[in-house]
């Protein structure tokens, strides 16, 4: 019979089983990295500069398939639901625009149109990052935080700019509760991803601006920071109407971070950051990363760029692809190299 205050069954201290859990997690990590090494070898066989040069559209379709639904659908030009004039500020008129997809999905952004816009005025999409909004990246909240006036630096260079709202805003700051990873999980069950959905919506917006005469088909560019840099890169890889891309503070090795909404089925065997960026070749691409970025290691950025460069070389387009590691944190470059590169290639 058990004595008072004694457990009914055999018991021991937690420390006795700690080693076993640690050995399990260590083994799981080793297994994953060993498999990643094998997957990288498979990726190197799946796509090479020579294979891409011979059949770029095969790989573009493969990327769309990896990202998933609805990128298998024809691009839909959305209906314009609302266009509200806010102000004339210097050389631009500022509008808030809302579009409707599928008859019910509302998608909005800020549009900056040159006061003296012409048919050949370049058109640029400007993407915010995690926690952001089009208003923030466009300096409408007086400060633009780590975006360093990204949108307005393009309007100052004579471009019409559309800055869309991606499903990334900070709920504590802006309200409108949402759970991106939860929604992405639902998209995965529909053979898609939030990346695929938002790339699809962005492609539809491009179609709208082209049809309205606000975006010349041969002068469309994209710029983005952090998550926005991811969207700039993926949108340009999928949509060849984009002639120049500036991706800042994102280009990295996704496997190291494995954020849920960046982790696609079989991605390690098909498309990493370098291979996704390769689908932009021979179109213009500028990649930037801060040397003291607190999220991504600039040395890994340089390693991934070394994997990317041969694709541009194979197409005789070395001058179309640039990397800049700038002195800074997780922020937009304070210098103008990327912005100048983008406008010069439009």
Q: What label would you give each PLM region?
A:
Residues 1-93:
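N-terminal targeting or regulatory segments adjacent to alpha/beta-hydrolase or S9 domains
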Residues 29-32, 291-293, 328-329:
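Acidic beta-to-alpha connecting loop that harbors the catalytic carboxylate
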Residues 84-142:
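Glycine-rich active-site/cofactor-binding loop and its immediate structural neighborhood
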Residues 119, 125-207, 211, 257-261:
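Cap/lid segment of the alpha/beta-hydrolase catalytic domain
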Residues 132-134, 169-172, 229-231, 252-258, ...:
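Flexible loop/turn segments at secondary-structure boundaries
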Residues 203-269, 273:
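Primarily recognizes the serine-hydrolase "nucleophile elbow" in alpha/beta-hydrolase
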Residues 256-313:
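The feature captures the conserved acid-bearing segment of alpha/beta-hydrolase catalytic domains
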Residues 306, 312-346:
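C-terminal catalytic histidine-bearing segment of alpha/beta-hydrolase fold enzymes
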